[in-house]
Structures are given as C-alpha cells and as structure tokens.
C-alpha cells in the first residue's frame, strides 16, 4: 500500500543521504 511504499522510499533516500554525508566528511579530513 501507499504507506509502506513511501516508508521504503524514505529509508532508501535516508540511507543514500547518510552515505553521501559520511563520504563528504571523510573527504574533508
């Protein structure tokens, strides 16, 4: 249903965002 689909999309998006932030922080060190 809509809710579980949007939740899955959000967790995927959050995972990608976290990954980008971590690699950005690593690059600045």
From Swiss-Prot:
Its main location: secreted. It is found in: Secreted. Keywords: Chylomicron, HDL, LDL, Lipid degradation, Lipid metabolism, Lipid transport, Secreted, Transport, VLDL. The keyword Lipoprotein does not apply. GO terms for molecular function: phospholipase activator activity; phospholipase binding. Belongs to the apolipoprotein C2 family. Component of chylomicrons, very low-density lipoproteins (VLDL), low-density lipoproteins (LDL), and high-density lipoproteins (HDL) in plasma. Plays an important role in lipoprotein metabolism as an activator of lipoprotein lipase. This is Apolipoprotein C-II. It comes from Ateles geoffroyi.
